[in-house]
């Protein structure tokens, strides 16, 4: 008989974007809704979080929106950061520093170009057991033969170099998408971990080319790369764990032509354009990001079951990440376990809970036309599809 119920220790998402303003109001409560009790929050806001004070203020806003969730803060690696600020951040519970190569993803214009410049920062981080979170891609450069399909592989020399210079520094290669990245992390010592997103366990290049809702950075790669991600989860490797990279974008930014170029049946909004510019969001092209927070743990269970790794669910969504970061003994971990129940069919007890909503809309914008770019709404991954597992709520 197949497993019908699973109880797992408190899930933790070690890479999530919770944005600002109305979008943050919409998506922050979704963290708990998706089954997660600890959220490691990215700092690429506008402006980016580069100081302890900014991080504390941001975490306070998030806690006001979702008091039941444990939020862990990070800083944005930039020239503004100093060793003294690192020490201050560590004393105030900020756990990591996120590195973005310049221009490779959302709000990365302040990203870095030369890692050696930051060696004093890394040295101080090593002293305080802080974590360096690496977005592992190089910027596209046609002259150098770099594009989105090999940007991650080309980055790996930087991972090896930083790890070699600072062997005691905890490093996480974020959202790995390639077999090369998986093997690179395995080759490194115990201080190097790796997050894998659920959507990269599902998608390949065919699934995002021409399909904006599945477009993210780094992009999903080839079937063999996806197989490597699945295999390392199935193996239960202790240094690979959940980081959803759940990244909400307004629908207008996933399908920008509908608002910015006057597509048939739409009406561009001047106020909408102003809103996009004011929030630092691109007004052309497709924003990179897949949104999974609201369905995260049931989605992970569904995917892992599909490729024969359901027995590794607890390691993937809770144990491995908490062990790497040192959150395995906190009260959230001890008392935040959740139970999942198998959804037998669409006619089961709670079919609505197993069907992913088509869209989430901020309550204040429910009467705003979809054609208005200022409308705060986000389409989740697998919208309209059925999940194989649901959270049992008391």
From Swiss-Prot:
Entries under InterPro entries matching the protein: Amidohydro-rel (IPR006680), DHOdimr (IPR004721), Dihydroorotase_CS (IPR002195), Metal_Hydrolase (IPR032466)
Top-level lineage group: Eukaryota
Inducing or repressing factors: By N-carbamoyl-L-aspartate.
Record GO terms (molecular function): dihydroorotase activity; metal ion binding
Listed GO biological process terms: 'de novo' pyrimidine nucleobase biosynthetic process; 'de novo' UMP biosynthetic process; pyrimidine nucleotide biosynthetic process
Cofactor(s) it depends on: Zn(2+)
Note accompanying the cofactor annotation: Binds 2 Zn(2+) ions per subunit.
Annotated positions binding Zn(2+) 2: 98, 135, 175
One GO CC term, this protein: cytoplasm
Modified residues (N6-carboxylysine): 98
Pfam family, one: Amidohydro_1
Top EC class of this enzyme: hydrolase
Binding site for Zn(2+) 1: 15, 17, 98, 245
EC number: 3.5.2.3
Entry keyword set: Hydrolase, Metal-binding, Pyrimidine biosynthesis, Zinc
Catalysed reactions, semicolon-separated: (S)-dihydroorotate + H2O = N-carbamoyl-L-aspartate + H(+)
Family classification: Belongs to the metallo-dependent hydrolases superfamily. DHOase family. Class II DHOase subfamily.
NCBIfam families to which the protein is assigned, alphabetical: pyrC_dimer
HAMAP family: PyrC_classII
Protein name per Swiss-Prot or TrEMBL: Dihydroorotase
Species of provenance: Mycosarcoma maydis
């Amino acid at each position: 008989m197949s497993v019908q119920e699973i109880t797992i220790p408190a899930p933790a998402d070690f890479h999530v974007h919770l944005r600002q303003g109305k979008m943050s109001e919409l998506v922050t409560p979704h963290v708990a809704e998706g089954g997660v009790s600890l959220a490691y929050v990215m700092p690429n806001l506008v402006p980016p979080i580069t100081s302890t004070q900014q991080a504390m203020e941001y975490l306070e806003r998030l806690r006001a929106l979702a008091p039941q969730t444990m939020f862990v803060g990070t800083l944005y690696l930039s020239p503004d950061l100093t060793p003294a600020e690192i020490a201050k951040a560590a004393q105030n519970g900020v756990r990591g520093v996120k590195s973005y190569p310049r221009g490779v993803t959302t709000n990365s214009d302040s990203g870095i170009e030369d890692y050696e410049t930051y060696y004093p920062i890394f040295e101080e981080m090593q002293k305080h057991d802080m974590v360096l979170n690496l977005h592992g891609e190089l910027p596209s450069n046609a002259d150098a033969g770099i594009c989105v399909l090999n940007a991650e592989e080309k980055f790996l020399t930087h991972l090896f170099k930083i790890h070699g210079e600072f062997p005691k520094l905890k490093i996480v290669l974020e959202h790995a998408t390639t077999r090369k990245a998986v093997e690179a992390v395995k080759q490194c010592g115990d201080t190097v971990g790796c997050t894998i997103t659920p959507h990269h366990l599902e998608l390949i290049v065919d699934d995002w080319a021409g399909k904006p809702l599945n477009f993210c950075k780094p992009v999903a790669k080839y079937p063999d790369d996806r197989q490597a991600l699945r295999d390392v989860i199935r193996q239960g490797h202790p240094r690979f764990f959940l980081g959803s990279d759940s990244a909400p974008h307004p629908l207008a930014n996933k399908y920008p032509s509908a608002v910015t170029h006057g597509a048939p049946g739409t009406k561009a909004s001047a106020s909408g354009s102003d809103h996009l510019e004011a929030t630092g969001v691109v007004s052309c092209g497709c924003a990179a990001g897949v949104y999974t927070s609201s369905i995260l743990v049931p989605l992970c269970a569904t995917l892992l079951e599909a490729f024969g790794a359901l027995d590794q669910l607890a390691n993937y969504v809770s144990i491995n990440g908490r062990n790497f970061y040192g959150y395995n003994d906190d009260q959230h971990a001890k008392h935040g376990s959740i139970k999942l129940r198998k959804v037998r069919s669409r006619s089961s007890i709670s079919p609505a809970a197993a069907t992913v909503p088509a869209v989430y809309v901020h309550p204040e914008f429910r009467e705003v036309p979809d054609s208005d770019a200022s409308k705060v709404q986000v389409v989740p991954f697998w919208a309209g599809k059925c999940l194989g597992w649901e959270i049992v709520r008391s």
